[in-house]
Curated annotation (Swiss-Prot):
Its main location: cytoplasm. Homodimer. Keywords: Cytoplasm, Transferase. This is L-carnitine CoA-transferase. It comes from Escherichia coli O139:H28 (strain E24377A / ETEC). Coiled coil: none annotated. GO terms for biological process: carnitine metabolic process. It is found in: Cytoplasm.
């Protein structure tokens, strides 16, 4: 198979990935593949472009490195072109409501007739099967968080709160990426493809698993705490200093002993409530948990972030300043690792945003292209799978494809 014009780089060079999906979750999986060197084809509706395009800046990050194909994949010759594309595809990712592709006649079995080795990743809010009440419902970040038990665990003691920005979408996209790569490994070993059913709510169920295990195995549910504190452990979570916020984790025998001396609680050490060798102070089970929080709050409020960081470094207590977004690009760690980078958009503008992650030493990722325009690569992709200029124009004339103006 000849590939589309693009530089060869990254650990996934030579891999062809196709995705159909809008907004964030499914496309984030495609973004990861594209930044790691795969040839990634982004399918958009012919009449209406991906709704993400209305955002002024984010699409330049989320759709960089992609090849844009505008094709009606469910109708007549457009469907035929899509199935022909599948013959040369390694991984196909679709994000929709439940078994939307199967309902429109594109089942796993149809795809495997054209490519027995194809890895298919279905990403939806509630999965490909289940009850009629849920399976076909639309889902976004907050829906998946609410249905999974994740949202109810977060927020303030008086009110739950979803995690932003769009946590469930990103976790689900990463799950699609890793699952598809696992399936590809097996498909190349056996010659038999795989179909993956990724339900966003199940992804978030796993993300919220830590505290849930106490309920499932004893009936006790961890309460939400106020002001960003850890629900279980004192000295862990968000705290306010004289000039801003830090997060800290008071974990370890020596760390607790030295911290207690600083905040005036040394007399509690080696007591029945806080015996020698204590590594964590349980906020609920330890009767002194509230007192530890009170004293720690007072001590931190009397010191600047710089003073706290210096002292905690001496005590080997993990902590970090809560950075504002404007502080990121000047932070020395960000600068040293080039965590924020720049690239050129298709119209020649400079765009700034997060760099590729993670960092591969021997086969690094690369930003080689900005976000393509709607239908920009339709002709090149169709020619790549054997279509002539006349074939392409016929698809366009029937409203089944869109090429760049």
């Amino acid at each position: 198979m000849d590939h589309l014009p693009m530089p060869k780089f990254g650990p996934l060079a030579g891999l062809r990935v196709v995705f159909s999906g809008i907004e964030i979750a499914g496309p984030f999986a495609g973004q990861m593949f594209a930044e790691w060197g795969a040839e990634v084809i982004w399918i958009e509706n012919v009449a209406w472009a991906d709704t993400i395009r209305v955002q002024p800046n984010y699409p330049q990050l989320s759709r960089r490195n992609l090849h844009a194909l505008s094709l009606n994949i469910f109708k007549d010759e457009g469907r035929e072109a899509f199935l022909k594309l599948m013959e040369t595809t390694d991984i196909f990712i679709e994000a929709s409501k439940g078994p939307a592709f199967a309902r429109r006649g594109i089942t796993d079995e149809v795809l495997w007739q054209h490519n027995p080795k194809l890895v298919i990743a279905h990403l939806s809010g509630f999965g490909q099967y289940g009850t009629e009440e849920y399976t076909n419902l639309p889902a976004y970040n907050t829906i998946a968080q609410a249905f999974s038990g994740y949202l109810i665990q977060n927020g303030d003691v008086d009110q739950p709160m979803p995690a932003f920005p769009y946590t469930a979408d990103y976790f689900s996209g990463l799950t699609a990426t890793t699952a598809a790569l696992a399936a590809l490994h097996k498909a190349r070993e056996t010659g038999k493809g795989e179909s993956i059913d990724i339900a966003m709510y199940e992804v978030m169920l796993r993300m919220g698993q830590y505290f849930m295990m106490d309920y499932f195995n004893g009936g006790e549910m961890c309460p939400r705490m106020s002001k960003g504190k850890d629900p279980y452990y004192a000295g862990c979570g968000l705290y306010k200093c004289a000039d801003g916020y830090i997060v800290m984790e008071l974990v370890g025998i020596t760390q607790i002993e030295e911290c207690f001396k600083d905040i005036g609680l040394a007399h509690l050490l080696s007591t029945p409530e806080i015996p020698e060798g204590t590594q964590l102070i349980h906020r609920i089970e330890c009767p002194y948990g509230p007192l530890v929080e009170e004293k720690l709050d007072a001590w931190l409020a009397a010191h600047t972030i710089a003073e706290v960081k210096e002292r905690f470094a001496e005590l080997n207590i993990a902590c970090a300043k809560v950075l504002t977004v404007p502080e990121l690009e000047s932070n020395p760690q960000y600068v040293a690792r080039e965590s924020i980078t720049q690239w050129q958009t298709m119209d020649g503008r400079t765009c700034k945003g997060p760099n590729i992650m993670p960092k591969f030493k021997n086969n690094p990722g690369q930003i080689w292209r900005g976000m393509p325009s709607h239908g920009m690569d339709t002709a090149a992709i169709l020619k790549n799978i054997g279509y002539s200029e006349n074939d392409i124009q016929e698809l366009v004339s029937k409203g089944l494809a869109k090429v760049e103006d």
